[in-house]
Amino acid sequence: MTRVCRALLFVLCGIFVHAQENELHFFGPRTDVLVVFTASREAQERETRAVQQLRLLVQDFEHQTPDVSVLVAITAHDHPPVPDFVPVDRLTGTKKLISLISSYKAPIVLILDETTGPPRLHTGAHRTVCPPWLLQAVYQHLTSHHVPIRYRDFDAILHRLGWLHEDPRHALYIKEHIPAVRMENSLYPPGALHTLPALLTQVYSEEWDTHYVSVSYGGTLYLIREQFFVILILGAVITLLLSLAIFSFLSDSRKRHYWNTILAMWWLPAILGVLSVCSVFVATQLTALFFLIRFGTHTSTGALPLLALIVKHSIAIALSCVCMANSKTIRDSMLHNGFIGGYLASTLCLLYAVLFSVIDFSLSAVFALEYALSLVFFSAQRKTTRRIMLAMMFLLFAPFLYAYLKNSAVTAPLSFHQSNVFFALGCVPFMLFMLTLFFEREKSHPRIPFIRRRNLLLSGALLTVLVINGVLWSVSLSSTRIPQEITACYRISERGLTLSLHSPLPIPRHIRARTHARLSTAEIQKAQDHLQISMDSRSYFGGRINVLEVRSQLRAQAIELRITSPHGTAAYEADRPFTRLEQGSVVRFISQARPPLPFTVTFSGDQNSTMQVQATVWTYDNPLQDAPPVMQDTTVRFIPMFELTRDVLFPSPSSQGVHATPEKNACIRDETVPNLQE
């Protein structure tokens, strides 16, 4: 049986036709550029202010038809109201919309969201930002219509670093290489959105520069393009070569002195780099250990991300200071050749302008500015000037530090798994600057013993660790005032009843326990009577078309089907997306959230094959008379949920006379479709 025949059969029989759940409104003639306004209903399918704004926009377009292609789409089932552990098809409406607009040559998407704060423009997701022409056009158009849109110029860099929360719908458009921006506002003035499609059609370009930086001033948005950063990196390389060649213009004695000092101190940045990386790695493991001891789970750092970052980096700084203070080699080298520390640090800044451009081109500009400040630091003779330059370098990275801590829910997973090396290497120039100032002070104040300053430093590091651990042990994840929500999932199958607890926060030790309760066969059968499975089988072209239907007396939140064919392929094609497992002998279907009942799946399979069907339904309705008790606690609020699983065996059509009916409430009907003449 060929795939063409199966597809033809599906079309002829009309077995599956799913209702379009997205609300679509097309306006204007069909052109290459399609401007899409879209918003999503909430989890309870309630219309948000953004959806209401789109309905007003539809009325405007009906009154005055645009001259370009415009689509107003209200998507459904993007925010399923089920816990994360329930396997449902998420972002269903957005996926359908993407498959629809992909037929156009140049779709442009504007996502509308409501907000309680000031209007804001979001340009990035999936570590990518929208094209610069789209950002500039939308920003200046809204400001010209007196919409006080808020856009932080620094957000473009943070989006590329992955340090900001991203909307999953926006990420889907970016992954499909569809230009998209997300606008948060409660209400737009009349005409602000109506005239936007014509402007976007005029400024559309296939160019997609992802490494730009924006500067907004006076209602105008200025863009620094990618070419600037390429030239900046080339300039950094040329400057580095010139800084090495400048030694040839020095006198022989000074040249020899500088080269001897550099050759004697070349190892210092390498040692500090290794020390910084090791300190951050050890601090990461110690922080995870402290949180494990305190909360009892390895994932507890995600529950308190800001505290986890503060603990980790405080320990890393303390370890680095302790190691540097106790290193006699570093002390002797800096006392005799301390002047070269600033030069080595400035050279590192120049190298980092090239190295960190691998992460993001715009970071090369930041390190180029740090290099300029480090040159002043190195050449300055007054200590006050050096301290001012060091403070300015700290201020240069202050926005990164603020965003790093503010968005700790996003940056903490990166910090604990991916970004340790780059973060540690980025601290090396500051370590060199601090060492230079520290040992210059020792030279100017020889009466203060070094051992006293070292002990003071060690005492400060130890006190920092003790204070942090005291704060850690005083923090609680839940309280009687704000109880922790835990989903208690009762799993009912032929094996009996099990209870599992799920929560985005770590579950306390005295509550985190799995209960294995026993149910009698009669109780299991009574619970499974709420779930009926039937299959209609049709023979066609040497194969079979199967229509599997799941009915439930319970209000289903999600449904999962696993179809197993032990001696063949479970499914070749189907009317729903599915996943093949175990080389095709098992297929898996998952529904959207709150699927309409009965849940029907149509698929093609082998002519004579035995099928094992496992249906799982998640519901908040109780199929049992009495649910097993859960431990009561004033700091926890339990949400009961039930996972009902039923297995049904459908024998092959050739053996139906031998086998009995599969099960109660499970039936199979066999019909033969006459062969169609070609």
Swiss-Prot record:
Residues 653-678 are annotated as: Disordered. GO terms for cellular component: plasma membrane. It is found in: Cell membrane. The keyword Membrane applies. Disulfide bonds: none annotated. This is Uncharacterized protein TP_0564. The keyword Cell membrane applies. Its main location: membrane. Keywords: Cell membrane, Membrane, Transmembrane, Transmembrane helix. The chain crosses the membrane at residues 228-250, 263-285, 300-322, 334-356, 361-380, 387-405, 420-439, 455-477. It comes from Treponema pallidum (strain Nichols). It is a multi-pass membrane protein.
